[in-house]
């Protein structure tokens, strides 16, 4: 009722879709989801956000059985090729075997695209920018902006793990990509503190 009054839009159960975006910024809104299910089940409600695992760490309990979760992941190499209209190449890669390898020119093309994918990563905005013909530099700027926004969000969820610890471990993982992760050099902290920060980053899908 209050939302209807604020936005001057009627909310009609069964017809209106209520969308809570960036819900990770409001712990109270996350807590309210279970009550919508229990007290207002006829209303269609969708919530979206990033680093939700960080926010959920702040809650004593979450609406188990009352909230259905859907996870969105970065692009896979297959999806990257499809976005670049290289479905034929992906089909050829799938059919290739050690006995029936790709022809050298096709193999070189696949490796070039793989290298670009490894540089760009799989974030949708970055891939969309690349597909639209933007330069690699433009794509890297978007990646920098995404990293900054993630780090800004770290500060909102620091009850369990200090923000500085999460940032240190996050930076260490990025700087040592492709190398074995060594706890001793990850941050100025003990094993337990580093593991807590790393576990949180893994749960958030920022580290795999």
Residues of each region from the PLM?
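Conserved AAA+ ATPase core "coupling" helix
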Residues: 73-95
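Short regulatory helix/loop adjacent to the ATP-binding pocket of P-loop NTPases
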Residues: 35, 53-69, 81-86
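Conserved catalytic/switch belt of AAA+ P-loop NTPases
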Residues: 30-47, 51-53
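Conserved RecA-like P-loop NTPase ATPase core
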Residues: 21, 33, 80, 121, ...
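Structural recognition of the conserved hydrophobic beta-strand(s) that form the central parallel beta-sheet
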Residues: 19, 44-50, 71, 80
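Conserved P-loop NTPase "ATPase switch" module shared by AAA+ and STAND
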Residues: 11-29
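Short glycine-rich substrate-engagement loop in P-loop NTPases that contacts/grips substrate
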Residues: 1-14
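Interdomain hinge/linker elements that couple catalytic modules in large macromolecular machines
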Residues: 87-208
């Amino acid at each position: 009722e209050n939302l209807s009054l604020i936005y001057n839009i009627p909310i009609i159960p069964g017809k209106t879709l209520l969308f809570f975006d960036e819900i990770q910024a409001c712990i109270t809104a996350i807590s309210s989801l279970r009550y919508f299910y229990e007290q207002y089940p006829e209303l269609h409600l969708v919530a979206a956000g990033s680093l939700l695992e960080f926010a959920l760490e702040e809650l004593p309990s979450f609406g188990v059985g009352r909230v259905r979760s859907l996870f969105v992941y970065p692009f896979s190499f297959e999806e990257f090729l499809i976005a670049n209209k290289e479905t034929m190449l992906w089909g050829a890669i799938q059919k290739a075997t050690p006995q029936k390898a790709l022809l050298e020119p096709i193999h070189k093309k696949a490796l070039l695209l793989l290298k670009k994918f490894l540089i760009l990563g799989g974030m949708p905005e970055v891939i969309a920018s690349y597909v639209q013909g933007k330069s690699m530099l433009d794509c890297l700027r978007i990646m920098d902006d995404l990293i900054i926004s993630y780090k800004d969000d770290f500060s909102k969820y620091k009850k369990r793990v200090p923000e500085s610890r999460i940032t240190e471990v996050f930076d260490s993982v990025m700087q040592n990509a492709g190398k074995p992760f060594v706890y001793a050099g990850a941050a100025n902290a003990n094993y337990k503190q580093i593991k807590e920060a790393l576990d949180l980053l893994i749960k958030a899908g920022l580290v795999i």
